[in-house]
């Protein structure tokens, strides 16, 4: 006898299909006959023959209420969207993009409206556009360009290092009011982030060794590095030496013009994202290495519109396979 499925069972069918499970295995999991699962898939798949849980639920509810083309979103979808906002800090555009790749079509403005209609106030603080960034002022003023020996200007950087080529990096530090610093690096084409607390503050030689250690596993894919004129990067020739590969052109560190943060926009944007989790008034002593690594992993798993809503991690490591 045919039994009407509920939303949770449809979601289990959707997950089972995505995992490649057989119809019989899916049927056993939700305690129905295989014929019920087959009927559900045939009846509620989309025009491309894909079975998507929330679309299937909407079609069922539309038939149930006699509303042809009913486009109301099931409550389960809103619960999932809430989790994406609260747990992952994803923007409506990122959520709409990721759901769209799953065949679930929802406009980012619809998600914004949902957030603004939330009377509990739980959702709004997690939206990126709710953050208010002021212009970053470092505890120590940038070193004048003339004080960095053997400095190579950004104006000598090759034209192909335009942010589209894989292997061009930017680096910077974020600081607190207690003299602590965190090194940040990003690969420009994928926005992949590396970060680590600097145990000796902004001393040039220890900073150079940390940069080289973080980039060493990927040194074959380090073509250029761009940074500002901070005193912590004065030992840039040590970075070049430590990342050198015999028979290949040496990695050059290029320095932006003083007070021209737009010349290294990728790392500036990365730092803003990091500040979501490490606010400016923080004491970095409160952030363990493990906690900083969790922040790095979270940002690298975050979908980006620039990457067609893929993650920096996926786009970065596809170059190694």
Regions found by a protein language model. Name each.
Residues 166-175:
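Two-metal-ion RNase H-like nuclease active-site motif
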Residues 175-178, 195-218:
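Active-site beta-loop-alpha junctions of metal-dependent nucleic acid enzymes
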Residues 220-235, 257-259:
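Acidic/histidine-rich, metal-coordinating catalytic segments
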């Amino acid at each position: 006898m045919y039994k009407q499925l509920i939303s949770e069972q449809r979601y289990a069918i959707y997950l089972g299909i995505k995992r490649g499970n057989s119809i019989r295995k899916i049927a056993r999991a939700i305690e129905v006959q295989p014929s019920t699962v087959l009927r559900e898939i045939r009846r509620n798949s989309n025009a491309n023959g894909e079975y998507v849980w929330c679309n299937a639920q909407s079609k069922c509810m539309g038939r149930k209420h006699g509303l042809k083309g009913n486009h109301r979103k099931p409550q389960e979808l809103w619960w999932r969207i809430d989790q994406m906002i609260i747990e992952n800090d994803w923007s409506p555009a990122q959520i709409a993009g990721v759901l769209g790749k799953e065949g679930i079509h929802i406009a980012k403005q619809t998600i914004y409206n949902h957030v603004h209609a939330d009377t509990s106030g739980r959702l709004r603080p997690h939206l990126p556009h709710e953050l208010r960034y002021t212009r970053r002022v470092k505890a120590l003023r940038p070193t004048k360009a003339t004080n960095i020996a053997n400095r190579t200007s950004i104006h000598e950087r090759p034209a192909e290092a335009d942010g589209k080529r894989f292997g061009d990096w930017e680096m910077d530090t974020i600081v607190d009011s207690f003299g602590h610093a965190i090194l940040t690096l990003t690969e420009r084409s994928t926005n992949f982030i590396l970060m680590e607390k600097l145990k000796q503050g902004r001393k040039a030689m220890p900073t150079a060794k940390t940069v080289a250690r973080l980039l060493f596993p990927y040194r074959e894919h380090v073509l250029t590095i761009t940074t500002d004129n901070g005193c912590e990067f004065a030992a840039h020739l040590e970075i070049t030496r430590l990342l050198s590969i015999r028979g290949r052109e040496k990695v050059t560190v290029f320095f932006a013009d003083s007070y021209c943060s737009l010349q290294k926009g990728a790392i500036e944007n990365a730092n803003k994202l990091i500040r979501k989790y490490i606010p400016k008034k923080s004491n970095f002593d409160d952030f363990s290495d493990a906690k900083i690594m969790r922040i790095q992993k979270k940002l690298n798993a975050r979908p980006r519109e620039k990457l067609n809503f893929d993650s920096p991690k996926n786009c970065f490591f596809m170059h190694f396979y």
